[in-house]
């Protein structure tokens, strides 16, 4: 039976991990064992934070809409409820952009929401 040498495979695997760990501080970018742990942990953080990013952006949009709506003496929840009653289906991302960049249109939406609540 022939002897199988796997040095090339191991070296390639180590190089791959060290390449992924490039830019890490200290031993995390130089020593395979430490770098491997750092790369795995970075992957876990990335996986978690891809999901958290969606939540955080939704929170940001809601707080922006809330700030804009409160200038018209209305609460965020009443505004959203008024839009639903008025059959205006605009998502929070777009509402947030409208509140920032086009205040006149946003005030028109607030007016429609108020009318729908009466």
From Swiss-Prot:
Keywords: Ribonucleoprotein, Ribosomal protein, RNA-binding, rRNA-binding. One of its GO terms (molecular function) is structural constituent of ribosome. The keyword Ribosomal protein applies. CDD domains: Ribosomal_L20. It comes from the Bacteria. InterPro entries: Ribosomal_bL20, RIBOSOMAL_L20_CS, Ribosomal_protein_bL20_C. GO terms for cellular component: ribonucleoprotein complex; ribosome. GO terms for biological process: ribosomal large subunit assembly; translation. Belongs to the bacterial ribosomal protein bL20 family. Binds directly to 23S ribosomal RNA and is necessary for the in vitro assembly process of the 50S ribosomal subunit. It is not involved in the protein synthesizing functions of that subunit. This is Large ribosomal subunit protein bL20. It comes from Buchnera aphidicola subsp. Acyrthosiphon pisum (strain 5A).
């Amino acid at each position: 039976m022939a002897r199988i040498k796997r040095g090339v495979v191991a070296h390639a695997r180590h190089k791959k991990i060290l390449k992924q760990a490039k830019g890490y501080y200290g031993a995390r970018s130089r020593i395979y064992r430490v770098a491997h742990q750092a790369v795995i942990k970075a992957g876990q953080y990335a996986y978690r934070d891809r999901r958290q990013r969606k939540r955080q952006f939704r929170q940001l949009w809601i707080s922006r809409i809330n700030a804009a709506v409160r200038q018209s003496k209305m609460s965020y929840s009443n505004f959203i409820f008024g839009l639903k009653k008025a059959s205006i289906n605009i998502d929070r991302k777009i509402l947030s952009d409208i509140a920032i960049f086009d205040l006149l249109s946003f005030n028109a939406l607030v007016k429609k929401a108020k009318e729908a609540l009466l």
